[in-house]
Amino acid sequence: MNKKLVLMGAGLLLTAATASAQKLVTGHVTDAQGQPVMGATVRVPGTKVITTTDANGNFKLSGVPASAKKLMVSYIGMNTATVSVAGNVQVVLKDNELGEAVVIGYGTAKKVGTVVGSVKKVGGSVVENKPATNVADALQGQVAGLNIANNSGDVGTTQNITINVRGVGSLSASSEPLIVVDGVPAGAAMLSMLGPSDIESITTLKDASATSIYGSRAANGVIYITTKKGRSNEKAQIHLSQNVGWSQLARSIGNPMSADELLDFQLENGIIYPQTYAYFKGHGANTDWQKHMFDNAAPLHTTDFSIRGGSEKTTYYVSASFLKQNGITYGSSVKRTTLRTNIETKAKDWLKFGIAQSIGFSENSANRFASTRSSNVNSPSTVAASWPRYWEPYSMKSTHQIWGTDSWGILFDPNYYVDAAPSKVENLVYNGTAFAEITPVKGLTLRSQLGLYAIGNRVKSVIMPSYAQLAGGGTGSAERQSVQSSSWTITNTAEYKFNVNDNNHFTLLVGQEGIKASYDEFTAQADGLLDDRLTNLSAGTVPAAASESNYKYEYLSFFGRADYDFKQKYYANFTVRSDASSRFGKSNRRAMFYSGGVMWDMMQEAFMRPASTWLTNLQLKASVGSTGNSSIGNYTHLSLSGNTQYGGEQASYYAQFPNSDLGWEKQIQTNVGLTASFFGKLTLDFNWYNRKTKNMLMSMPLPYTTGMSAMMKNVGEMTNRGVEVEINYDIVRTKDWYVNFHTTYSYNTNKIDKLFYGLDQWDDKGSLVSYMVGKGLNYYMPIFAGVDEQDGAPMWYKVGYSGEAGYTYNPETMTKDESQIESLYQDTGKKLFAPHHGGFGFQVSWKGLTLAADFSYVLGKYMVNNDYYLNTSSSVAAQGLNLDRDALQMWKKPGDHAILPAFKYNSQFDTHLLENSSFMRLKNLQLSYDLPTTWMQATRFFENIRITFTGRNLFTVTKFKGVDPEVDSSLTTGNYPATRQYTLGVDVTF
């Protein structure tokens, strides 16, 4: 009995001791203006005890150890505060100059709201939460003026994204923006090698005030990617993420006839004999080639791991990510591994240095018959829409043959073609930077940085000898390609910040930058392979053919920038840059670029104080400046020769005339902007811009007597003009609820101002485009007037006339003479570049449950649907291929109101193929749940666990009949379709 009493007493004492070892701490958090801060994080350093403030800025933190002396309070955009644990804690958080900072190129980052230029920052979470293999794809619709098109859903390719900022700035030089990763210029391949979870932010620089500091490479804007770094005075935080899912077709391909419909059509139009008709009818096959060619459950898997933290002087971020994804076509897949290390240390009060580097390796297997714009009969998209459904694969898979194709000389299963001609691409991409930063006196920062962007690419392609028809002659072939490229960048800057009294704040920056790049490519091929097991080049019985190419280019630049503000009310910014490029002749090698901008923060004015209860921010800004475009060939200014065979002997020929007058393409851009916030909930950004391209590089036609067809010259001028609108509205923001709506919209018009030879118009029938001074780039084609209801003949409008397609022939305005088709080309009025781009989305959160969606759209877009031509053409139908069900509406008898002419007429390349490809697409839909904080505290191990389910490209609204309306092309043929994806993920933070 005494023993039991002793044990009970000990238990009570232990319970009391435990209770006394923990306590409840309450407090209140405000900003410098005394406004409550909702969502601030309050934690006990070194423990898992954590909570957040409510809508009134109040918090209750339970389970605080009695030994705890300090609390850490943090919030995005504000300095972290460390306060004593005593009574009712009152915390005032001050703005952090770098918390909500944007990096606009060189020097220290700037606080949001003090940047004069037109820039937009997107947080890394936007990219991290979207299952895209290319980070640019996740930005669609997020930034006004940033237009992104995914041209292929093939995971076996890397260069499948088109990016433009504020329209297309050049017709011959590149219109791609400059991509910078942690201060190092990088190529588009880097976008497919970045781990989404490694990205801290992506900032788009759009106007001259923001981009002019980059000079000759920034004519088309700048996309600056900042990767995650460690945090000072924070213990290690470990993050692990696992995602699994599958991909499928985003939308059906075409509308092919069924087996019975096609057989009836072919019999009716004399394409097959009655006995053939009966033969296929009796067999009864109705193969769905789309299901045969595309996998609607192609698996994908990603794993991301990172650890970040830091001491008082050293910070670190280390990560690894792995992606494995199968394509929806047979034989296409990608495996990608990415490693990153970012380390910074403050060795002395005046010395800081660090490195940021990543290396990525990918192995891509591509379906060689699924290449974009391929009309190969074995292309998956072509098979899905064009192969007769009364064909079918043989049941004996060893034959690999397609039943019913005897008249075609026996066709094989397209998936066997992939096995017979495998192709593998290996990519190794490195991006790294090392810097040293010295602060010898207060306000002065000297920085030197060395960066390297390098790519190693290896391609291995084989045609197996076991497949005689594909290999030709019963032997195979092998091809190897190796590409190595590198770009070294060294940057030295001096930045000095100082104040003149308390009202005048200055930041002066001067710098120098040098870039040295090289490219080497080697290709070799051997024929005569005799054994599928021996596919090396040395196994070929025919001597290998080899080729090699290489080039180098260099830049040398000097630049400066001055920033000034008066009382943080009036801001001014001026930049200058001098660039020299080896891509131009000595007389035009160097160019100067300038910019200037001003901004007025009206809410700092005394007369605006009465409106401060509802108008929380109002800024006006304006800028003008110049940038350059040097994205042309490396030796375009030189005289080049080539070698060939003539009369059985080696001969030389002129490959390119000397072009010493070739100079810089310059752009002068004006921007006027307004930013306003209402009630601290609704934010509006508006920008108007005028982007003038001068000395535009154009491929100028030459007389054939010169022996050349064209020559690059600075002869053109072009203008892009537009507006951009961004709206963000926090509809509800309480302790438990958060409802947000956001939208972006941009309108851009393109106009030719000057052409070569003083011409007012230049027609390019081959490209279906007409260049007309005073107008934008429009499609140039015969205008389809419809089908004559009397005889089923196609009708076209005569030059100078236009209208809708109808059924009544008017000889004054129309013609039915197919022989005149070449003389009927005219301006269609349909724009080559869509003027309207945008996106919108919402987020609804209740406690830990969140539903978010993002849509993107393009309006006023047109593309020539060459697939529709192939699937409705009489000449193609005569070969026995399947047709679109629209062909059932061909004209048959007088009085028919048909959309296609009678079968006896050949289809022509006219506007009946020019389709409205405007679209709206649900890019991402995500449902996530964060487990309660109290659960995490109870474990004393986890900080957060989030479960997510995400859908990508869930539906598309469009009138376009082709494979995918998103493709950035004037003509579509056999494009690899977009994919819909579903992923389930778990994110754990320790």
Residue ranges and their predicted role:
Residues 1-340, 345-348, 352-360, 431, ...:
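Short, small/polar-rich motifs associated with maturation and membrane association
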Residues 113, 232-286, 327-332, 338-429, ...:
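Surface-exposed loop/interface segments of Gram-negative outer-membrane beta-barrel transport/assembly proteins
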Residues 595-599, 724-727, 925, 929, ...:
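Outer-membrane beta-barrel "beta-signal"
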Residues 831-864:
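Glycine-rich, aromatic-lined ligand/substrate-binding cores of catalytic
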Residues 227, 309-311, 322, 341, ...:
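Residue-level signature of outer-membrane beta-barrel architecture
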